[in-house]
């Protein structure tokens, strides 16, 4: 938990998920003792590099254990850091609803809700990371996935309600019996 909103917990419960919230400093052993089907990397405030100081190693170890991971907002940025990427402060952050994002896999445009001032840097992104979504405002990275692993994230709030519902499929993807496809 990097600062999860109550609406996100409701979002997962709508999909019949059993959710256990743990501190962002919880050890990998403790997380694994809960026998999770997946780990959600939540949103939260601040600079991802500051939070990443203690979260990156935990995320890297979960990836090694092949635990499915799904991150949003700050969780997206910290996941990128854990995978060897970089983040930077944006000149102008993305705030509010109605941000068009292109899904580079389906070619669909999704209208999203966003609230962030940092972004994942495109240059020198490791080759094992696939960019899955981009902003149609400024071409910034809005989604990534780790190739050949059930690990993915988006920069925006797919659960935003009231608000755009174009990205609600992420919970279905994450909670499906085979999130590796």
For each predicted feature, which ranges?
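Conserved small/polar residues in nucleotide/adenosyl-binding loops
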Residues: 174-181
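Hydrophobic anchor at the start of a short beta-strand
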Residues: 19, 69, 151
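Catalytic beta-strand/loop cores that center a nucleophilic Ser/Cys/Thr
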Residues: 108-149
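Phosphate-binding active sites in nucleotide-utilizing proteins
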Residues: 2-57, 61-62
């Amino acid at each position: 938990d990097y600062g999860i909103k109550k609406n996100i917990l409701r979002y997962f419960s709508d999909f019949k998920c059993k959710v256990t919230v743990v501190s962002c400093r919880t050890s990998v052993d403790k997380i694994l003792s809960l026998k999770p089907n997946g780990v959600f990397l939540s949103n939260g405030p601040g600079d991802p590099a500051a939070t990443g100081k203690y979260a990156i190693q935990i995320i890297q170890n979960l990836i090694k254990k092949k635990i499915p991971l799904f991150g949003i907002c700050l969780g997206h940025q910290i996941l990128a850091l854990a995978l060897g990427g970089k983040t930077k402060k944006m000149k102008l952050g993305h705030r509010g609803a109605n941000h068009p994002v292109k899904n580079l896999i389906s070619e669909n445009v999704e209208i999203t809700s966003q609230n962030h001032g940092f972004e994942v840097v495109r240059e020198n992104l490791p080759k094992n990371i696939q960019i899955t979504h981009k902003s149609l405002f400024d071409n910034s990275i809005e989604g990534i996935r780790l190739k050949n692993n059930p690990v993915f994230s988006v920069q925006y709030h797919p659960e935003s309600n009231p608000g755009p519902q174009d990205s609600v499929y992420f919970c279905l993807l994450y909670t499906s019996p085979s999130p590796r496809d």
